[in-house]
């Protein structure tokens, strides 16, 4: 693995391919591909390559937290020839009804889990199903440990995995030891077939409500599946959770990058020498308080009006004092 920093990019990270030797031909067909990944809110992302757009679990928030200027618009969708909207399951935080209004403006293909309510528009997929959506887009559905499915999309040779609600859902405050063991077994069984795939980019939950072991599922997924790049999601607005996970969990096989700001983007370039060049397309935001004393260090405020309150926790680890679920409304 190699890390380099250049100007004007904020970050320039090269990730050496961890593909097995017998798959060297598959690596060569992926070279010189460029992706743009955009984070919206919670588990919502888009992945764009040339004139193809993938949208996963788009949600504008319970109270419409996603700012208007960061939302997907019909004007944006019209810039693509192929648009695919993936809905992993029917939980409100993974499905915003607005996605079904887009089809009145542009042609859209919806891919939804087979257990969605009757009448839901889209191509239904159950675990084990596979679809060819176009010459450049193929998709497989895998199991989840909650409702619905997880998706693996092959986009012109680049494999993108979105977990949906696949995770090790242990609730240590509420569950018995037996229930936790059953959840662990179910999660391991769900991950097993995914581990047979070669994954370039994975979006995976790190849910702050689970307490100290909030990252148990993500770490196990990284250990077994070894995606080249993992982006945490489903952190319920707790940006510090995602960034701390990225800081602690990156390893030789997998780079971890946290996208935490509405509309934050990264660019991926799959190079001829088997690396992924990762660059930030939205520069870091540092807001300096107007009240600061010029003789003092700048006061950095949290962007997007999201407060980070670590009172009662060790500054280096927000879960150091408890392995019980953290209630977000406290």
Please identify what each model-predicted range represents.
Residues 1-53, 60-62:
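Zn-dependent metallo-beta-lactamase
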Residues 30, 38-40, 121-134, 145-147, ...:
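Binuclear metal-ion centers of metallo-dependent hydrolases, dominated by the metallo-beta-lactamase
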Residues 30-35, 48-54, 130-139, 152-160, ...:
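Beta-strand-turn-beta hairpins that frame and shape the catalytic cleft
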Residues 42, 62-63, 90-95, 117-120, ...:
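Active-site environment of divalent metal-dependent phosphoester hydrolases
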Residues 44-86, 97-101, 166-196:
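Pre-active-site segment of Zn-dependent metallo-hydrolases
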Residues 55-59, 81-95, 111-114, 161-164, ...:
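Active-site neighborhood of phospho(di)ester-bond hydrolases with catalytic His/Asp-centered motifs
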Residues 72-131:
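Active-site HxH/HxHxD metal-binding segment of metal-dependent hydrolases
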Residues 145-223:
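Active-site-proximal loop/helix segments of hydrolase catalytic cores
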């Amino acid at each position: 693995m190699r890390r380099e920093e250049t100007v004007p990019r904020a970050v320039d990270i090269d990730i050496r391919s961890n593909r097995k030797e017998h798959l060297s031909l598959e690596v060569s067909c992926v070279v010189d591909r460029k992706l743009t990944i955009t984070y919206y809110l919670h588990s919502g992302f888009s992945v764009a390559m040339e004139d193809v757009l993938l949208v996963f679990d788009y949600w504008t928030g319970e109270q419409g937290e996603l700012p208007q200027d960061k939302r997907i618009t019909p004007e944006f969708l019209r810039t693509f020839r192929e648009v695919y909207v993936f809905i992993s399951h029917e939980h409100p935080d993974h499905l915003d009804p607005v996605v079904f209004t887009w089809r009145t403006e542009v042609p859209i293909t919806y891919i939804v889990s087979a257990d969605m309510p009757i009448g839901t528009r889209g191509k239904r997929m159950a675990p084990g199903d596979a679809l060819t959506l176009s010459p450049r887009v193929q998709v497989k559905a895998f199991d989840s440990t909650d409702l619905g499915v997880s998706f693996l999309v092959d986009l012109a040779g680049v494999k993108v995995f979105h977990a949906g609600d696949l995770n090790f859902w242990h609730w240590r405050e509420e569950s018995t030891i037996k229930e936790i063991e059953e959840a662990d077994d179910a999660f391991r069984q769900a991950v097993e077939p995914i581990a047979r795939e070669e994954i370039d980019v994975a979006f995976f939950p790190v849910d702050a409500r689970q307490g100290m072991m909030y990252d148990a599922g993500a770490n196990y997924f990284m250990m077994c599946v070894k995606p080249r790049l993992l982006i945490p999601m489903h952190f319920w607005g707790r940006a510090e959770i995602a960034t701390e996970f990225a800081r602690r969990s990156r390893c030789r096989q997998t780079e971890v990058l946290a996208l935490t700001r509405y509309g934050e983007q990264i660019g991926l370039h799959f190079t001829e020498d088997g690396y992924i060049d990762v660059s930030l397309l939205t520069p870091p935001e540092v807001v300096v308080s107007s009240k600061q004393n010029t003789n003092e260090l700048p006061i950095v405020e949290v962007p997007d009006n999201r407060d980070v309150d670590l009172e009662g926790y060790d500054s280096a680890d927000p879960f150091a004092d408890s392995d019980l679920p953290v209630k977000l409304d406290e």
